[in-house]
């Protein structure tokens, strides 16, 4: 029996970092990720706090709308759009506590009908339903 030939693996070498010892890129270099320009409010901590509280209220409102939409979907026919433009339809049953998976029944896929299934939320691009 012959021993397998080792296939060489390409190695990516990063340039030296700004301090000369590490590898990587300078944070202010031309390859640094672009960050959106956000005006900083430094003069008044109360204004900064109110901006953070406004963002928090907006997030809370969006989360509440999302959770209410999940509650309204229970027992209804829902159409899901997945990656690669795949469209499936199913009766929505439930979701887990982390809202990471949807439990559905009568899942109609391009290759047939599945009696029960779990859809990962990370695979779902959008969903629609009629209440």
From Swiss-Prot:
Its main location: nucleus. GO terms for molecular function: RNA binding. One of its GO terms (biological process) is mRNA splicing, via spliceosome. The keyword Electron transport does not apply. PROSITE patterns: SM (PS52002), SUZ_C (PS51938). Residues 1-29 form the SUZ-C domain. The modification N-acetylmethionine is found at residue 1. PANTHER family: GEM-ASSOCIATED PROTEIN 7 (PTHR14679:SF1). The SMN complex catalyzes the assembly of small nuclear ribonucleoproteins (snRNPs), the building blocks of the spliceosome, and thereby plays an important role in the splicing of cellular pre-mRNAs. Most spliceosomal snRNPs contain a common set of Sm proteins SNRPB, SNRPD1, SNRPD2, SNRPD3, SNRPE, SNRPF and SNRPG that assemble in a heptameric protein ring on the Sm site of the small nuclear RNA to form the core snRNP (Sm core). Belongs to the gemin-7 family. This is Gem-associated protein 7. GO terms for cellular component: cytoplasm; cytosol; Gemini of Cajal bodies; nuclear body; nucleoplasm; Sm-like protein family complex; SMN complex; SMN-Sm protein complex. It comes from the Eukaryota. It is found in: Nucleus, Nucleoplasm; Nucleus, Gem; Cytoplasm. The gene is GEMIN7. Part of the core SMN complex that contains SMN1, GEMIN2/SIP1, DDX20/GEMIN3, GEMIN4, GEMIN5, GEMIN6, GEMIN7, GEMIN8 and STRAP/UNRIP. Part of the SMN-Sm complex that contains SMN1, GEMIN2/SIP1, DDX20/GEMIN3, GEMIN4, GEMIN5, GEMIN6, GEMIN7, GEMIN8, STRAP/UNRIP and the Sm proteins SNRPB, SNRPD1, SNRPD2, SNRPD3, SNRPE, SNRPF and SNRPG. Interacts with GEMIN6; the interaction is direct. Interacts with STRAP/UNRIP; the interaction is direct. Interacts with GEMIN8; the interaction is direct. Interacts with SNRPB, SNRPD2, SNRPD3 and SNRPE; the interaction is direct. Residues 65-131 form the Sm domain. Keywords: Acetylation, Cytoplasm, mRNA processing, mRNA splicing, Nucleus, Phosphoprotein. The modification Phosphothreonine is found at residue 3. It comes from Homo sapiens (Human).
């Amino acid at each position: 029996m012959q021993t397998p030939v080792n296939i060489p693996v390409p190695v990516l070498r990063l340039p030296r970092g700004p301090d000369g010892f590490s590898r990587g890129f300078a944070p202010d270099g031309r390859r640094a990720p672009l960050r959106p320009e956000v005006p900083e409010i430094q003069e008044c901590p109360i204004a900064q706090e109110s901006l953070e509280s406004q963002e928090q209220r907006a997030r809370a409102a969006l989360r509440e709308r999302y959770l209410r939409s999940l509650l309204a979907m229970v027992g209804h026919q829902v159409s899901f759009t997945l990656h690669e433009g795949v469209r499936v339809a199913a009766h929505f049953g439930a979701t887990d506590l982390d809202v990471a998976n949807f439990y559905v029944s009568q899942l109609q896929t391009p290759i047939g009908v599945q009696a029960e299934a779990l859809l990962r939320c990370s695979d779902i691009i959008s969903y629609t339903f009629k209440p």
